[in-house]
UniProtKB/Swiss-Prot annotation:
The gene is lspA. GO terms for biological process: proteolysis. The keyword Lipid biosynthesis does not apply. Keywords: Aspartyl protease, Cell inner membrane, Cell membrane, Hydrolase, Membrane, Protease, Transmembrane, Transmembrane helix. The keyword Aminoacyl-tRNA synthetase does not apply. The active site is at 123, 141. This is Lipoprotein signal peptidase. Its EC number is 3.4.23.36. One of its GO terms (molecular function) is aspartic-type endopeptidase activity. It comes from Escherichia coli O157:H7. It is a multi-pass membrane protein. Pathway: Protein modification; lipoprotein biosynthesis (signal peptide cleavage). Belongs to the peptidase A8 family. PROSITE patterns: SPASE_II (PS00855).
Amino acid sequence: MSQSICSTGLRWLWLVVVVLIIDLGSKYLILQNFALGDTVPLFPSLNLHYARNYGAAFSFLADSGGWQRWFFAGIAIGISVTLVVMMYRSKATQKLNNIAYALIIGGALGNLFDRLWHGFVVDMIDFYVGDWHFATFNLADTAICVGAALIVLEGFLPSKAKKQ
């Protein structure tokens, strides 16, 4: 028996669209207004800095000859499809999990678009303390990390809170 999409976690797919719009919009603004390597200070310890990432998080496999572009694209597609299926199988009232899944899907698709369109991921957020700089990242990465943190948080909540 089929169920209404609004009664499933797919009801939260609108959040994927929001993440994509914000992520791709921010990357578009960077590409239109920055040359590669340009930096603009925003606040103490936070810069906008245009960088290209040919690998994964922390530029993992960035210098691997190009095959990693397709490898990470495949991972993004696989994870996104898996999470959409999980959203379909969950109730719309399971907000925390569905929000987490939507954030991860939105971030994965934002970076997937970059990999397929540009051949690299556009990064622009440079957090630093003194001379130490964290790896440059983007809003898609942030959405993925927040989504993953919500999944971990959900694991620590009492079962009554999980059902809501």
